[in-house]
Amino acid sequence: MKTKSLKYIFAAGLLCCGISTTMTSCSNVLDEEPRSTYDPSFFNTQTGIEGGLSALYAHLRYFYGNGYYLNTLETGTDEYTYAQSADGNFKDADLSGVGSVTPTSTVAGGAWGELFTNINTCNGIIENGTAAGFSDALLAEAYFFRAFDYFILVQTYGGVPLDLGNGKLKFNTTTNRTSVRNTVPEVYEVIFADLEKAVNDLPDNPRMTGTATKNLARLYLSKAYLTYAWWLENPNNIPTYPECSRDASQAQSYFQKAYDTAKTAIDAPGPYGLMPTFYEVNAAQYDRNKEIMLYADHSENEKFGNGGAGYGWGNGGSPENFAYWMETWNYTEMTALSTAGDTKVYPVQRETYQGLGRPWTRMAPVADAFLEGGVWEDDVKAIDSRYDATFTLRYHTNTAKPGANAGAWVYGANGMKINSGEVYFSFVDEATEANIDWTPTKAMVKNGDKTEEQEVTRFNFGKLPGRADFVRSVKNISRKCYPINWKISIARTDTDNSFNNFVNGGSPRPWNVAKFSEFYLIAAEAAVKLGKNADAKEMVNVLRARAGKMTFNQNDNVAVNIDKSAEMIAATPDVIDIDFILDERSREFWGEGYRWFDLVRTQKWTERAKTYRIGGNGFTDTTLETVTRDIPAGYYLRPIPQGQLDGMEMTAEEKANYQNPAYRN
C-alpha cells in the first residue's frame, strides 16, 4: 500500500511483533519465539522466512477473538443489536439512529491495517522463499494467506490496492504516501490465482497442528467463487467501488465452480470431517477437533498462549481472545434470598466455566430470532440440538464453590429450595410465556440497620407452577438480559479454582475461523443458484440430520441419547431457497462473525435486518419494542478508515475519490 499509515502499521505490526518458528522441531505444533526487532533484509534468510510463516498464523489473533471486530460482523444484522452497556462502537454498527458509521468508526477500521501488514509479509515470503530453499508446499501457505486476507478486504471495502508501494504484489520496504485502489474483479483475479496455487501445492494433511492444507484452500476458493458469482449477478443493484463493469452472464459459471470445489472436498475430506454432534464442535474439551480447519490459537500457557498478554485482568485488546465478553449479559447481577431467609446473595457468580465468564453486555441477540418465524422459533427449539449447544439458557447456581461464599443453597421460585449446582434462572420458549406468573417475589430483607420488603431477584423474574427456577420467556429478551453465546465462551482446565482472576482475562480457547461444515452450506447455496434443488436439499440435510442428534444437553449438564434426525429431515422444506440457506447458516454459525458477510453476499441485509424487536435497558424491562434500521445500498461496503486517508499525501479530491461514495462528506 502506498501510504505512510500502512507503512507504519507494517513496521509495528510485523517487524516488531514477528514470531519465528523452528521447522525442524520434534513438536507437531509451532514453536514460537518472540523477537523484538527485525528489518526487511530478514526475509532474505531462512530464519526470516520461517518467522514470516509463523507470523501468518499469529496475525489471526489480532482480529479473530477481538470483540470490536466481532461487533462489525454481527451488530446491525438479524442476529445482534447493541446491549445495555454498549458504547458508541456498538451503537454505530446498529444503524438504528443511536450512532452513525463514519470513517472514524471502529466499523470502518475492521482489520484493515492488520490485513495489509500480513499481505506484505506474504509478499516477502513469496519473493524470497525459493532462494531461501523453501519448498512449494511451504510457500503455498503464504499464497493461501494472501488470498485469505484479500478476500476479507474485498468483501468489506470493495476494490483495494494490490500495489503496496513496490509494484503489484511486491514486497514493500519503503514509505510511500499515495495509493490506487484496484477494482473488485482485479482483486478476485489474485484471490483465485493464489488459492488455486495453494490447492495445487499444499499437502493433504497439515505439516503441523493447525497449518494450511489443500482442503482449507478449497474452502476459501469455493467461498470466493460463490461470493464473486453473487457480485456478478448483483440481483438488487448494489453499487460497487471503484466503479467497473460486471457481466451477470458469467455468474452461473462461478456458482458451478463453487459447487464443484466444495463437493470435491466433501467427497475427499482428508483429515477433516463432521463431528458426531453439534455440541462436540464447540465444547471446549473438543477444541481443535477434526471439523475445525483453521483457528486463531490460544492456550493456557502464560507466556505464549495469549500472544504475550497473559491471563490476568484483561483490557479488551488484541491479541486477547475477549470477543465472548461482548455477547455475555451481566448474569452476576441476579440476586437470591439466602439460606437465612433475610439477606440477599448472588446465586450465579462469574467463573471460568463455559457459558459464563466475564460479562460486558455490549451485544444482545434480537428477540425476533427466537420467536415465531425466526431461526430459533419454538418448532426449531423442539428438535434442533443446535439451540441447546449455541446458547446458555439455564443458569446454575455456584454458591457452594470455593470463593463464592454464598451458602449451600438459596430460595428459588415458589419458595422452593435450590441447591448449589441447580438451576436458578431459565429462558423458556415463546409458547410458555402465556403461563408465566409475573407477580413480584418479595421478602423482608435486611438493608443495613433496617429490614424492608424487596423484590428478591432484582430482575422481577417470573414463575411457573411447580418449578423452583425463576424464568423469562424468549419473548422477554432485552438489552439487559438475554441468552449468552455458549459456543465462544471461556473455559479453563483449572476448574478447582474457577473464581480466580483468570475469569477477568481473555479466553485461552482457540477462536474457530474455518469449519468443514461450511462446505455443505456453500454447496447448497450454489446449488440453489444453479437450480439444483435436490442437490441443495441433500447438502443441508447432512447438517440437519446431525443437528437432530444429542448426546449431551449442556444446559442441563447431563448426558442424553436423543435422535430427532428424522424429524429434522422431515421439517426441511421441499424447495430450498436462499432464505432457508441463510437460516441454516445462522443456526450453524450464530454469533461467530459470519453474518454480515452472509447478508452482504446474498444482498439480503436490508430485507432481513431492517427492523427488529427487543426489550429495553432496565432490569425489569420485558416488553418488546420495534426498532427500525436505515441500511442504504452504499453501506454494503464499509468506509475506508480515516487514518488511512490522513496518512496519504494526495489532494483533497483524490482522497475523497479514494473513499467509498456513501461516506464522503
Over which residues does each language-model region extend?
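Bacterial Sec-dependent N-terminal signal peptides
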Residues: 2-3, 18-47, 147, 191, ...
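Membrane-proximal, proline-rich intrinsically disordered regions
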Residues: 26-72, 644, 648-665
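Conserved, well-structured interaction surfaces
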Residues: 46, 50-68, 85-160, 176-214, ...
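Short coil/turn linking the two alpha-helices of tandem helical-hairpin repeats
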Residues: 154-161, 206-207, 224-236, 531-532
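Flexible, polar/acidic helix-loop-strand segments at domain edges
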Residues: 361-514
